[in-house]
Swiss-Prot record:
It is found in: Cytoplasm; Nucleus; Cytoplasm, Cytoskeleton, Microtubule organizing center, Centrosome. Keywords: Cytoplasm, Cytoskeleton, Neurogenesis, Notch signaling pathway, Nucleus. This is RBPJ-interacting and tubulin-associated protein 1. It comes from Mus musculus (Mouse). A motif (Nuclear localization signal) lies at residues 81-97. Interacts with RBPJ/RBPSUH.
Length: 253
């Protein structure tokens, strides 16, 4: 009960009576007694030392301005002609911004955008590049591929066509596309590793060998089929690049 009594009494016992401020008098009216007049302060951008507006009869205005310009802390130690130290936080100049013009209107000199700042503001915005990225123009890394690809088939096409005609006469399979011809040529290189001797590799590869085969008889492997042997023994045949490689039989058959 005692604690509750103290809580009930605490707001009234510790209340501080505040005097009516200037804001209270402006909003809610002045109290019974009259309040002294507020001093008339100059705006911060006015830099004059003459503050003798409401001064009555006395010394001349020049002496008052001279006395006001002196700092109170330096009157005793320094001479009287020392000027007052400048306040570094005083607002020297202010150019109206976009927010100022939006809230308070344009100034008398003219709008901020009419002075010539519109051209400067355009450089702040992002501008798209001259060539759009979604166009059908080829990428720079695709151009060397276009220069390399046509040169490959033009050199090897006459030999491939001649070899395909001869292979069709012998009854061997003929590939249809250049990609298959290249894959078959790679299989020719891998055939000697399965069981052929190293000496027969340049003879069976056709155009891959440095010297063409002049003699009709060749060294035959036991794994080569009879159909492929009959084609070799018949005579010196032109190199066939597109012919299918013979499938070797395993030794246990």
């Amino acid at each position: 009960m005692k604690a509750l009594h103290l809580q009930h009494r605490s707001p009234t016992s510790y209340r501080v009576k505040a005097r009516a401020s200037y804001v209270d008098e402006t909003l809610f009216g002045s109290p019974a007694r009259t309040r002294p007049a507020q001093p008339d302060f100059d705006p911060p951008w006015v830099q004059n030392c003459n503050r003798s507006r409401g001064v009555g009869p006395g010394p001349p205005k020049g002496s008052l301005a001279k006395r006001d310009c002196e700092s109170p802390s330096s009157r005793g130690s320094t001479p009287n002609l020392t000027p007052r130290k400048k306040n570094k936080y005083r607002l020297i100049g202010h150019a109206p911004s976009y927010c100022d013009e939006s809230l308070f209107g344009t100034s008398k000199e003219g709008s901020r955008m009419a002075v010539g700042d519109a051209a400067k503001l355009r450089t702040l915005f992002w501008t798209p590049p001259a060539t759009p990225r979604g166009s059908h123009t080829p990428c720079p890394r695709e151009t060397p591929l276009r220069a390399i690809h046509p040169a490959g088939p033009s050199r090897t096409e006459p030999r491939v066509t001649a070899g395909s005609q001869m292979s069709s006469q012998d009854g061997l399979c003929v590939p249809c596309s250049l990609g298959q011809r290249r894959s078959h040529s790679l299989t020719h290189l891998t055939v000697p590793s399965t069981g052929h001797p190293a000496s027969s590799a340049p003879q069976t590869n056709g155009p891959w060998s440095p010297r063409p085969n002049t003699s009709g008889a060749t060294v035959q492997s036991p794994l080569v089929t009879s159909k492929a042997c009959s084609g070799r023994v018949s005579g010196p045949a032109p190199p066939r690049r597109g012919a299918c490689p013979p499938k070797p039989k395993p030794p246990w058959k």
